[in-house]
Amino acid sequence: MGVKGLNQLIKEHSPSAYKEFQLKNLFGRKVAIDASMCLYQFLIAVRQSDGQQLTNEDGETTSHLSGMFYRTIKMVENNIKPVYVFDGKPPVLKGGELEKRLLRREEAQKQKTALGDEGTVEEVLKFEKRLVRVTREQNEEAKKLLQLMGIPCVDAPCEAEAQCAELARGGKVYAAASEDMDTLCYEPPFLLRHLTFSEARKMPIDQIEYKDAIAGLDMTKEQFIDLCILLGCDYCESIKGIGQATAFKLIKEHGSLDNIVEWIKNNKTKYTLPENWPFDEARQLFMNPEVTNASEISLKWKEPDVDGLIEFMVKQKGFSEDRIRSGAEKLKKGLKGGVQGRLDGFFKVVKTDDKKRKADPKESKASKKKKK
């Protein structure tokens, strides 16, 4: 679900935290990607011309494999080294959000069934996309594909986005990539959004710098987390009637979520606290996430196993052999020499004095002669 309204608040108060660029601008970078999030995107976006998911002859869905294979190759071709991080067990507090998602899927199934044969292709497709979920089998297939491609993947003990942020904080990668804005609660130096979107969607990649974001909001780490909880996150529901502007204002006025809760309890306000609202437990999950220390994780990119890819993707999953071989060659070429250095890795940026430096007298005379 992410955090409602956080994106807009940061754009409003911390515009310098945002940058937009194309995939090629990330050349020379290593990036930790929330695998479950991008698999979900692939299952929704990678479709046949009739709107149905890709399948093999046995009727097994292959949209997730197609998306993972070709988008990863595109990154490697742009000299980007991806590492995919998979979710572990969900926190107990997330059970409520997961239950809501299940109920939404059940409702979508009822609405789709009610359409019968009278629904348009667009209507049926709308409900089918709401029914999408990433299965355990699809996760395992994605891991197998990545292994054959020579791309590292990490099994997080808990939340994938928290582990992505840990890898970024620990210097193993440049940034964490996820569509969930709550990734920022785990303090990655940079958050990348839309990284795994298809180029056909023509959406630039968004980069959000964590330090600039909280500096623009003029908040501490703790206040930022409290703001995210107040806006509504996966771990607990929001307070009815409190939107992004009000949430920001309340944090500024009261300083913490504890003080806001006390203010609501002790004063006649239009706000009602949810029953047994676990805001402090949610805060602890953001403050002390269950992750594997970055220093304990070794990331290695290897040459693809072409024979293994042919066996899995062509013989088992029904993909074109020519396309898989072509993709494997692109992987070999992209991964062969390692990550090339970026220019900003060779040059130190030095701030110049704001005052205009005095012109060299010789330069001044020369320039005057040229003008004559």
Swiss-Prot record:
Basic and acidic residues: bias regions: 353-366
Region (Disordered): 353-372
Known EC number: 3.1.-.-
Keyword Nuclease included in the entry's annotation: yes
A Gene Ontology term for the protein's cellular component: mitochondrion
Listed name of the protein: Flap endonuclease 1
Function in brief: Structure-specific nuclease with 5'-flap endonuclease and 5'-3' exonuclease activities involved in DNA replication and repair. During DNA replication, cleaves the 5'-overhanging flap structure that is generated by displacement synthesis when DNA polymerase encounters the 5'-end of a downstream Okazaki fragment. It enters the flap from the 5'-end and then tracks to cleave the flap base, leaving a nick for ligation. Also involved in the long patch base excision repair (LP-BER) pathway, by cleaving within the apurinic/apyrimidinic (AP) site-terminated flap.
Region (Interaction with PCNA): 339-347
GO BP: any one term: DNA replication, removal of RNA primer
SMART domains for this protein: HhH2 (SM00279), XPGI (SM00484), XPGN (SM00485)
Gene3D superfamilies per the UniProt record, alphabetical: 5' to 3' exonuclease, C-terminal subdomain (1.10.150.20), 5'-nuclease (3.40.50.1010)
Keyword Transmembrane: no
Annotated source species: Candida albicans (strain WO-1)
Entries under SUPFAM superfamilies matching the protein: 5' to 3' exonuclease, C-terminal subdomain, PIN domain-like
InterPro entries: 5-3_exonuclease_C_sf (IPR036279), Flap_endonuc (IPR023426), HhH2 (IPR008918), PIN-like_dom_sf (IPR029060), XPG-I_dom (IPR006086), XPG/Rad2 (IPR006084), XPG_CS (IPR019974), XPG_DNA_repair_N (IPR006085)
Compartments in which it is found: Nucleus, Nucleolus; Nucleus, Nucleoplasm; Mitochondrion
Binding site for DNA: 47, 71, 159, 232, 234
